[in-house]
């Protein structure tokens, strides 16, 4: 197994995010601050810790506009998996958009926030994290409220 020095991949501005015990984290930074890169590394790292314990867990990734999911958060998670050398442990799908660990079934689910009611119909258990990409751009606070109800 290849060792990865995460401190070289993370903007020092976001170091505190890695050790916080707070349930909600807001990462602020301008374009090019590597917010999404740091978040994706954190989420993949979190999932892999559970997988190593033999547990099945899930992560929900939400972005305002569904049509940009693949070019943003989906590819960002794939990038993080590549950096962490775990890509070969996962199976990718674009319809429905998921990235699934082949042995445990742990899955990254990707949803557009265009229609908050669609989030209500998705039944996903064992959720360890929800990523709201570009949270400030969400047009409707219902997306946040509805997703928390279903966690």
Feature map (PLM): residue ranges:
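Phosphate/NTP-binding elements of NTP-utilizing enzymes
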Residues: 1-149
């Amino acid at each position: 197994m290849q060792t990865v020095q995460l401190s070289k991949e993370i903007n020092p501005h976001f170091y505190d995010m890695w050790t916080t015990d707070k349930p909600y984290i807001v990462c602020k930074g301008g374009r090019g601050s590597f917010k999404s890169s740091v978040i994706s590394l954190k989420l993949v790292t979190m999932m892999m810790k559970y997988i190593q314990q033999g547990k099945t867990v899930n992560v929900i990734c939400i972005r305002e506009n569904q049509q940009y999911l693949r070019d943003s958060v989906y590819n960002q998670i794939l990038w993080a998996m590549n950096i962490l050398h775990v890509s070969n442990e996962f199976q990718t799908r674009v319809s429905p958009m998921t990235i699934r660990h082949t042995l445990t079934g742990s899955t990254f689910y990707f949803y557009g926030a265009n229609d908050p009611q669609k989030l209500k119909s998705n039944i996903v258990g064992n959720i360890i994290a929800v990523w709201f990409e570009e949270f400030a751009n969400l047009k409707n606070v219902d997306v946040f409220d509805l997703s928390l109800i279903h966690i």
